[in-house]
Amino acid sequence: MSASKEGKEKKGKLLGVENISPPKDKRPATRMKLLNDVGAGEDSEASTTTTTSRTPSNKQEKRGSVAGSRIKILNEEILGTPKTEKRGATKSTAPAASTVKILNEKKTPSATVTAVETTKIKTSPSKRKKMEHYVLQAVKSENTKADTTVTVVTEEDDTIDFILADDEEVVPGRIENNNGQEIVVTEDDEDLGEDGDEDGEDSSGKGNSSQTKIKEIVEHVCGKCYKTFRRVQSLKKHLEFCRYDSGYHLRKADMLKNLEKIEKDAVVMEKKDICFCCSESYDTFHLGHINCPDCPKSFKTQTSYERHIFITHSEFSDFPCSICNANLRSEALLALHEEQHKSRGKPYACKICGKDFTRSYHLKRHQKYSSCSSNETDTMSCKVCDRVFYRLDNLRSHLKQHLGTQVVKKPEYMCHTCKNCFYSLSTLNIHIRTHTGEKPFDCDLCDKKFSALVALKKHRRYHTGEKPYSCTVCNQAFAVKEVLNRHMKRHTGERPHKCDECGKSFIQATQLRTHSKTHIRPFPCEQCDEKFKTEKQLERHVKTHSRTKRPVFSCAECKRNFRTPALLKEHMDEGKHSPKQQRSSMRSAVKIMERTDCAICDKNFDSSDTLRRHIRTVHECDPDDIFGVEPHPSKRAKKDIESEEVVPVALNTSAGSLISSQTDGNGVVVREFLVDEGDGAAQTITLENETYTILPLDGAIEGEQLTDEAGVKPEAKKEEAQVSPVVKKEQRKSLAASLAAAIADNLEESCSEDDFSGEILTEEDIKLKENVGKLIDMLVDPPILKKYGWPNAPEETVLCKVIENCGHDLTKGGENYAELDYGSRMREYCKLLFTVVIHNDSIKSLLNNFPIDDVIEYVLGDEDQDEGGLDKDNESHSGDEEAVSVTGETKTNEIREKPEKKEVSAKSEKKEIVGKAVDKDNSEEVVRENKKKPVGEQEKA
């Protein structure tokens, strides 16, 4: 405790401050800091001639620290009398003003603030010189118009200015001298320029008008170039553009100490063919990505750049260059610099920009026609196109383009590697770097490197966003002139690069080279003679060979393929091909093919496999659970019987087309409807009134067309055994007749023109139709598809509407698509979809080399093919087969009509209706076959 008290007494005696213990109810002592190191480093033996006869020793504090010698002024409860001055006291500008006190209590000062005096502290001359560059001031301003400065006056009229310390907490209060005069000490923010006035107003409002405040002058220093700023915002803005490295001034101080050594090393470097100002080889000197702001030279490394700045662009103009705008550091370096102008072949340089030239008239021309000219209008323009030039030789070379004269490549500038000739030596040197792989110019903003400085400058425009070249037609801007020239060819329609094989023309030579590879097909298949353009296409083709090599075991009856003999044997053991099972398998196949609409979202699909995949992916449910759920009645009412097709091969089901050509037009359409009652244990419906139409058509009211629920009897199975086969035959015939009449009445309303266009589709057309449907689902948004009537509308209609909606008129194309068959029409529509609607160059290139069917499958991907293979395997396990077919021998066309479903009891039954259109002979054949069957089989049927 005694040691701390002695320290406080010493600090207090530095300016003659009384150290009186503060009262308990006062705040902690306020600290003030002298930013100039006046008392730093002095010996404890140095004495003064005032009340403070000895200064404290501050050897522990290093010079350059944030805090200099600190003065701690303690609070005083009672105003004390000043001590008597000792021998050797200095003169003061105001009497009895050597004591400064800080009081926490608020008192109104009786007089204005006067200057504070103290004795001089002796400092060595070296220390004094080092402190000359500090400019430290604390300014206090009154609410009145009088402004004074608080200073510490020394013996030799020197002033020691001080400010409040930043790192110590400043307690607001008043400074009072021996005469009772007080100085208000306020707390200012770090940014004085913005917040100082507001704080001053708050503090001054608490006292009288005679109260004053002390403002801090805080200097914010840049850590790179050590430039000071009054505001934080100014410092932040400066840091964005400061080009100096953080340690440049430290290295500059070392170079100043070793200036003589640098001069000796410069002479040695010149003898070794190394540039003395940047220490780079003369082969690639002054060529890099770090540009000098004072001259046109650039450098590869930061060290070379700093050495150049230190030697060539000195802050003093004691040794200026007589040729260029450089200011050398010493006379010896100036001599080397001027010798460099002469020995390196460019003795003439511009005083403004520093660019050097080999001849004097080049310099004069530069000074006349460049931005360094006093008269900026000294330019030369082309009289043909009004283009402006600064050099006469550039104008002459430009005029050769109008005359049609081409610059001839000189054979002396020939590359020995590729035997190409160039216009000049500089272009040859740049070209040689493409063979050697040398890229000396790297971008400082990314990792790219370039073989020429021009390429680096063009690349940097992409980082800066500079686009100096703009199109006069569409005002689109570009960073490189070559890109603009290529863009202009789009407006003019110029395509100078033409393919010799197919005659196609392109804008760029690279596009032609890429296109030529399509004719070369460098990837041949080792197993066949086919060739492919890309390696990916070859890999896809090789997979087809692996699939065909796999052994196939076919069923002799149904021509079905199986992977293993065990699967084939299992298929034969199931007895699917026995006469008794063929009819049930037909009905099971019809049952499988019937359900293609989703019971959740009412969306229709081409096949049950697509429906299953939709349920798994979209609704995330098990398809087996959904298949047993009936759709909502409101959704079922929207579906017509004629909107479903069982046999995709025969789309023409009109009455005229179903009559065989061999009947000479005398055939009659007779439709037979097979009603699947389910297994024998389920409840069945007994037709009690044959005069009723028992199938709900077009969502009619159930009570009008169906028998009521009283017609459904639990004991229906027993009653069925009492019905004779003749009655059942008549009932079945009446049912078929009524259904045929109902369908004929609603045929024109419910069936679309495309479904009954009278065209017979092949298997390829059916596959194309399915792929087009998937393509439409993938490319067009669902709201637009719903607007066009999808999925109820046919694929061809929706595809035509999509193409016409995109602005292409199918009637003005000059082609009559109506004369083509279904497959050709769909292929032409798909080509229009890819070329006119979808602007994709990769798809267009595929169309030039592959048929449209392959392009559609390529767009859809290989997923459908893989799933198709899995579906075949699953079908082989299940043993179900599609038994509905069309044969020319029997002249039979089959379609499926799907009626509305009626829930009769808890175990509702699905009725599946299959219509057969046959002529008279075939219909009688069917009736005779039904007569031959036993009664039990008829009941089961």
From Swiss-Prot:
Subcellular location: Nucleus; Chromosome
Zinc finger (C2H2-type): 220-242, 290-313, 319-341, 348-366, 380-402, 413-435, 441-463, 469-491, 497-519, 523-545, 553-577, 596-619
GO cellular component, one term: chromatin
Record keywords: Chromatin regulator, Chromosome, DNA-binding, Metal-binding, Nucleus, Phosphoprotein, Repeat, Transcription, Transcription regulation, Zinc, Zinc-finger
Gene name as annotated: su(Hw)
Pfam family, one: zf-C2H2_6
Protein's name according to its UniProt entry: Zinc finger protein su(Hw)
Region (Disordered): 1-97, 176-211, 864-941
Phosphothreonine: residues carrying this PTM: 186
PANTHER family according to UniProt: C2H2-TYPE DOMAIN-CONTAINING PROTEIN (PTHR16515:SF66), PR DOMAIN ZINC FINGER PROTEIN (PTHR16515)
A Gene Ontology molecular function term of the record: chromatin insulator sequence binding
Listed Low complexity bias regions: 47-57
Annotated source species: Drosophila melanogaster
